Every structure is written in structure tokens, then in C-alpha cells.
Regions:
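C-terminal effector-binding regulatory domain of bacterial HTH transcription factors
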Residues: 97-106, 116-164
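Hydrophobic hinge/microswitch elements
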Residues: 67-111, 116-119, 149
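Acidic, Gly/Pro-rich loop/turn segments at junctions of secondary structure
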Residues: 1-75
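Residues that form or immediately flank small-molecule/cofactor binding pockets and catalytic motifs
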Residues: 4-5, 52, 81, 114-117, ...
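Alpha-helical segments flanking ligand/cofactor-binding loops in enzyme cores
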Residues: 14, 40, 83-84, 138
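Short, flexible helix/strand-to-coil boundary loops that buttress conserved ligand/catalytic motifs
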Residues: 34, 60-63, 104, 113, ...
Length: 164
């Protein structure tokens, strides 16, 4: 599935779901006395970056943390690698809804804060317009949309899980 703004001329385009960016970490990162009670507390942990440090700067600014020093923590080139590092307890990363849903639902990751950034780009289901009404295409598209909607329902029930 392509990731982008939904502009693919000549194709039938359906948004899989809206996309937000938010911090996630492994519950094992917060064992013992380690706490995350305010967004600024994240700076006491390794921040796992993807491509550059801009997403963390944007997220922290939106959460009311200005002028944070972001030169610590690894910079990885794939979101999946950053999520794997967070799962391993190596730090806190910023994750997208669709890429972290399963790990959040199953308790392998947690969201320490409800703050999130809405992203303009997301994942899309696309197919040539000539094939959009084929039964196998309709069945597959409807299944994908139902799975995404189910994940979002479970995530809403889950909410933010803090370790105190």
C-alpha cells in the first residue's frame, strides 16, 4: 500500500485511515523508578529518531516543550526499525497509528501521553479504476477497511497507558 497524500490520477483511491504521530515505548523501559509523567520527561530517555530529528522537534513543540536538545539517541532510516528498537526497550520513538496498532493493542508498546500530531500523509488502498468493482477487489478493500476500523476501535478503548 502506498503512503502519500492520496493523489494518484487514474486510480481509485481509498484512505485506509487517518494517521497520527505519537511517542511509544516498551513497558520494560519504565520498570523501577523510571517515570514519564510529562512530555519533557522523555528527554531523560534515549529518543529514537527516523531519518532526522525533525519529527521529535515538532512533536515536543506541540506538547509544549520548546528548545529541547535532541542530539541524543540513534537516527534510523526506517520506521519499522525504530519501532523494533522501542520494542527492545532501547528508548522512545515516534510511531504512526497504522504501523504501531498491533503492538499497542497487544501491550508490547504503550503510549505514555495522549498528545499526537495529525499527519497529512497516510496509507491508501489504490487500484486501477477499471478494476475497482471486481468482486475480489471489493472484498479485499472492504476487509482491509474493516481491519483498520477494528484496530482504531481497540486503540480508542485502550487510550493512553501510563506507568506510574
Amino acid at each position: 500500500m502506498p503512503h502519500g497524500d492520496g493523489n494518484w490520477p487514474g486510480f481509485d483511491v481509498v484512505r485506509l485511515s487517518s494517521e497520527q504521530l505519537f511517542p511509544v515505548c516498551s513497558p520494560k523501559l519504565l520498570v523501577g523508578r523510571r517515570r514519564l509523567t510529562r512530555p519533557v520527561d522523555e528527554l531523560k530517555f534515549p529518543l529514537i529518531h527516523v531519518d532526522d530529528r525533525k519529527d521529535w522537534a515538532r512533536w515536543l513543540e506541540a506538547a509544549g516543550v520548546d528548545g529541547a536538545e535532541l542530539s541524543h539517541g540513534p537516527v534510523l532510516n526506517r520506521v519499522s526499525m525504530a519501532i523494533d528498537a522501542a520494542l527492545d526497550g532501547q528508548g522512545i520513538t515516534l510511531a504512526r497509528t497504522t504501523l504501531s496498532a498491533t503492538d499497542l493493542i497487544n501491550g508490547r508498546l504503550l503510549r505514555p501521553f495522549a498528545d499526537e500530531l495529525r499527519l497529512a500523509k497516510t496509507y491508501w488502498i489504490i487500484c486501477p479504476k477499471a478494476t475497482t468493482t471486481l468482486p475480489k477487489i471489493v472484498t479485499f478493500r472492504d476487509w482491509l477497511l474493516a481491519e483498520a476500523a477494528n484496530d482504531l476501535r481497540q486503540l480508542k478503548k485502550l487510550g493512553t497507558r501510563r506507568r506510574s
